[in-house]
Amino acid sequence: MKLKKVTAILLTAVMTAALAACGSSSGDGSGSSGDDAGGSGTYTIGICQQMEHAALDAATEGFQDACRELFGEDNVEFDVQNAQGEQTMCSTIVNNFVSSDVDLILANATLPLQTAAQATSDIPILGTSVTDYGSALGIDDWTGATGVNISGTSDLAPIEEQEDMLLELVPEAQTVGILYCSAESNSKYQAELFEAELEADGISYKEYTAADSNEIQSVTQNAVEECDAIYIPTDNTMASNTQIINNICLPAKVPVIAGEEGICSGCGVATLSISYYDLGYQTGEMAYKILAEGEDIASMEVETAAQVTKKYNPAICEELGITIPEGYEAIEAE
């Protein structure tokens, strides 16, 4: 009897311990609910930013602010890494995120998005500061949702309105140069859309592409010698080299219409601007829906900026003698 009683007591103790262990389990690490994220109610989000410049910095800041507000300061942690525009570094960063089994990856710009897509099919990936997800991910029959572990926000401003802006501010333009980095697929996509608008209006154009920052000076010099105006789409390489572009275009009196505010503030006359901070914040809201509310990322359509604003660069407009009509906001000097 005593032996049976002792055995029963030991068995009860073992079962109680096992149940307690199950109750404190951190789950499978998928990040599908706040209770099992990171084993302590905390989500870990890996952020890979392609390079440093104002637009991408603002998107990262907006994303983090949204996550902190929605999840709570103590419930989300960030591992923020900058790839400095290098493919090898980008791969290393993303692979480290995958090895660490982060709950979600924010891919800030096209290169991190493409790299993350190749690295994992399980961890949710949100892109931001990406123009066209279809071309970036090689999806031919693009419908707005990827059908896989990827979604995000697009920074594409209406191309037709950008072309209208160029014709409004530079009505005498007969030949327009399209300046972008040939290594950035999103830039090529925008260039093709812009060219179609120019063709429809009977305006001739010529492409000027740089493979990297080392070629920007020479191709920009060629552009100002052959064109009346220049269009630069959202392009990370160009955004990091606006001083070089401005030092050539401004003395040549060739106005630049820019695809985003960061480029415009450095070398442009005007832009149809989105707020990259707001775009990042919007992406943070998507992260909350995925991690905290269990929304299926595969069926989430890529979102665009809620609003766009006409903005101009007062200093460059004055230098070129361009009068800005009503309806434009001045870009504040830094």
What is the meaning of each model-derived region?
Residues 3-24:
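Sec-dependent N-terminal signal peptides of Gram-positive bacterial secreted proteins and lipoproteins
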Residues 20-40:
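Bacterial lipoprotein signal-peptidase II cleavage site
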Residues 33, 39-71, 79-89, 183, ...:
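Extracytoplasmic "Venus flytrap"
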Residues 38-39, 133-175, 274-295:
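Hydrophobic alpha-helical segments within soluble ligand-binding/sensing domains
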Residues 45, 63, 151-198, 296, ...:
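An alpha-beta-alpha
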Residues 79-141, 232-259:
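Beta-alpha junction/loop-to-helix N-cap segments that form part of ligand/metal-binding clefts
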Residues 185-254, 260:
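Pocket-lining segment of extracytoplasmic ligand-binding domains
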Residues 263-315:
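Flexible loop/turn connectors
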